[in-house]
A protein has these predicted regions:
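N-terminal cofactor/phosphate-binding cores enriched in small/glycine residues
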Residues: 89
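Hydrophobic helical h-region of N-terminal Sec-dependent signal peptides
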Residues: 7-15
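C-terminal motif of bacterial Sec signal peptides marking the signal peptidase cleavage site
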Residues: 17-19
Length: 572
């Protein structure tokens, strides 16, 4: 549960420790710390007064202690949405069960029992040494047919398991993937593909690791398996869940301002053609997401087919936060249905395999109360299983068994209030000269080109689904926010990189408090970076990386200046 503390004095944050000789980051500024409490809200050095409030006055919590990621925004308080926020928080934190109210409906196949499993401490997951779907493991499996038939980062998702593959199932069903057969190894990088040495000019070393994931064909409880379809080559990647704090503020960034950012970057770096038409100097047709019927914050109806610019997830597959990763995940991670989600998150290949499994059929036949029991014959049960597990079957209106929505409209509304109402902790230590120096260097070496410091929210005329019936959500009008992202995808060309190659620039705000909130400070899309320095240096693994030149400049900084950049990143 959240812990609220107003005008608290920031606790001392430990500097980065890479475990590979980075003592300089531990000691560079030891003994020089002064409390920032008396400076909060004041202009100091090269920081404006507003920069203490990364989420603006309506989106920032002054709490910077353990648990601050859980805090609601001042907008929630001002709009009188505290009760809805707290009830929505419960939906995020509690374990869903198969049939015990109020959090029921788990399965038949699922990824986790709780959102908190993937977002421990409201963070983005911790690096794991093995794959088990439990608390702290924020990893999602990525399974696809590699375009090169080997291990390319690119290629279409396999169709036999869901896009976010499931490793759990409610009895008597088998999970689509047997997680006991998943093998995860972390491999040390012995040399940078770019040729950049793995020792800084002053003698300090850095280490990098990357994941290798393998899943044998026998682990798949589907018919057919992915190894029998497509090009019959199957590749695997890991993606850790995205950060959730402050996402309502990102939803409030105007589309026209994001377009201006694309136009500003397009002359200097190749942008994803799926999002930007360079010749037209405008968004590509595939940059737009088609929404269901809804309503805008000002009360204007939004008919089905309304288009919004994609901006959420690494792959930028979602537009409005209210139909974004969290709104989707509360359904597909648990497979909990609601009135506007009458279909299961499953595949036809899994449904077929379960309908053909004699042990599954026998278990259902022995339980006449099962919704899959049908006429009680093996043939009737198999037919019911095949169709009721099929992702195209309306669970509330079919000829085999009509289920009821498992999440109520009010529950879903409360969840969206919570999701849009999560705050960003205030900045820390902006009064310190080394943090001010880090800010200067961050801009000078080019990091701010992609990690754009600030945006303005304007009217925040958000879209909301019709199921909310016009109920208000937290709104962030006319706020200056400091997320440090350009809201655009770039490519880093890492070893065993992200599926699809393109990844949206991750916001840096609040990440310096990850250790205090989650117990870990892992970074990048698969948590391969164990600290800030490793995250930075992965940007220079390949000379093809969009960030190679900036990272090369970081590499040649003095040890004290490198430490200043780290201090700055941990402060914002």
């Amino acid at each position: 549960m959240k812990r609220t503390s107003i005008f608290v004095v920031v606790c001392s944050l430990a500097l980065l420790a890479s475990g590979c000789g980075h003592d300089v980051y531990e000691t560079a500024f030891a003994g020089k710390r002064e409390s920032d409490a008396k400076y909060v809200g004041q202009a100091v050095g090269n920081f404006t007064a507003d920069e203490w409030y990364p989420g603006g006055r309506l989106g920032t919590t002054l709490n910077v202690t353990e648990g601050c990621y859980e805090d609601e925004t001042p907008a929630v308080n001002e709009m009188g949405l505290d009760r809805a926020f707290n009830l929505g928080e419960a939906a995020f934190e509690r374990n869903f069960t198969i049939n015990t109210a109020p959090f029921k409906g788990l399965g038949p196949a699922y990824l986790r029992t709780s959102c908190l499993d993937c977002h421990p401490g409201y963070g983005h997951g911790k690096r794991q040494d093995y794959y088990k779907a439990g608390y702290g493991n924020g990893y999602l499996l990525v399974i696809y047919h590699p375009a090169d038939g080997a291990n390319s980062d690119d290629g279409p998702y396999v169709a036999e398991v869901t896009g976010m593959p499931q490793t759990k199932a409610a009895a008597p069903f088998l999970p689509p993937i047997d997680e006991d057969r998943i093998v995860l190894d972390w491999v040390p990088v012995t040399a940078m593909e770019s040729g950049l040495p793995m020792t800084f000019p002053d003698g300090e070393k850095y280490e990098l690791i990357y994941p290798e994931l393998s899943i044998p064909e026998e682990a798949f409880n589907t018919d057919p398996t992915p190894f029998q379809t497509g090009n019959k080559a199957v590749a695997f990647r890991l993606e850790s869940t995205i950060g959730i704090i402050g996402t309502g503020l990102l939803d409030a960034i105007p589309e026209e301002d994001i377009k201006a950012q694309y136009q500003a970057e397009a002359p200097y770096v190749a942008l994803n053609p799926a999002f930007w038409d360079k010749d037209a100097n405008d968004f590509a047709a595939t940059a737009w997401y088609t929404l269901a019927e809804g309503r805008f914050a000002d009360g204007t109806p939004a008919p089905a087919g309304t288009k919004k610019l994609k901006r959420f997830t690494y792959a930028m597959t979602r537009a409005s936060l209210q139909d974004g990763a969290g709104a989707n995940a509360i359904w597909n991670i648990t497979n909990v249905s609601r009135r506007d989600r009458p279909f299961l998150y499953t595949t036809k290949a899994w449904a077929k395999a379960m309908s053909e499994n004699p042990e599954v059929i026998a278990a259902i036949q022995a339980d006449p109360s099962s919704p899959y029991h049908a006429d009680g014959t093996p043939e009737g049960i198999a037919d019911a299983v095949l169709h009721l597990l099929d992702p195209s079957t309306n669970q509330f209106d079919n000829e085999w068994h009509n289920f009821e929505p498992e999440m109520g409209d009010d529950q879903y509304y409360n969840f969206l209030v919570w999701h849009r109402g999560l705050s960003i902790p205030r900045a820390r230590d902006l009064n310190r000269p080394e943090v001010q120096r880090g800010k200067e260097l961050f801009s000078e070496i080019g990091c701010a080109s992609c990690h754009r410091p600030s945006w303005k929210t304007k009217s925040d005329n958000y879209w909301a689904p019709a199921i909310l019936d016009g109920k208000p959500l937290p709104r962030y009008e006319e706020q200056t926010i400091w997320p440090y992202t350009d809201m655009i995808q770039h490519r880093l060309f890492m070893k065993n990189g992200i599926h699809g190659s393109w990844c949206r620039t991750t916001p840096l705000w609040g990440r310096g408090l990850s250790k205090a909130n989650t117990g870990a400070e892992d970074r990048l899309h698969d948590n391969r970076a164990r600290n800030v320095v490793e995250a930075i240096m992965w940007h220079a693994y390949s000379k093809e990386s969009d960030a190679y030149r900036s990272t090369e400049k970081f590499y040649y900084l003095s040890a004290e200046d490198r430490a200043a950049v780290v201090e700055f990143i941990n402060a914002i």
